[in-house]
Amino acid sequence: ECLYAQAEKKLEEIAFDEYSEVLFISKSVGTIIASAYAEKYKIKCCQILYTPLEQTFMFEHDDAIAFIGTADPWSDVKKVIACSKNQAVPIYVYEDANHSLEKENILQNIDILKNVMEKTQKYLR
């Protein structure tokens, strides 16, 4: 609640209806905050959800993309994947990657980062 209140205070002066496009990029608990805010204020926006939590999907997503690792200790990965698919949100799953989308091997981390950024770029086009 405290984090949500902080975000709400920071965003209160923005007239979102004056913009033709709005993009929320969030990670972890921030995915819950961004999703809740967008729903509460009826902001038509695109969302990039990096390592979302299950609670993120308590809110509807009309235009979003998500990324998660199967070794994410902060998420119930199977539930997140199911919720994402239930809302028709494309979700990219990285085998054995943690909450930072990292593994033990740095070269694999670079490959994951490259893949995530390529998919993010494609989504933004």
Where are these regions (language model features)?
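Catalytic histidine-centered segment of alpha/beta-hydrolase-like enzymes
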Residues: A97-I112
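Gly/Ala-rich beta-loop-alpha elbow adjacent to hydrolase catalytic centers
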Residues: F24-S35
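Short beta-strand/loop motif that positions the catalytic acidic residue
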Residues: E60, A66-I68, D72
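Serine-hydrolase catalytic machinery in alpha/beta-hydrolase-like enzymes
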Residues: E1-E21
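Conserved alpha/beta-hydrolase fold motif
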Residues: L23-F24, Q47
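Acidic catalytic loop of the alpha/beta-hydrolase fold
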Residues: T70-S75, H99-S100
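A conserved short beta-strand
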Residues: K42-Q55, D62-D63
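Conserved alpha/beta-hydrolase "acid-adjacent" motif
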Residues: M58, P73-K79
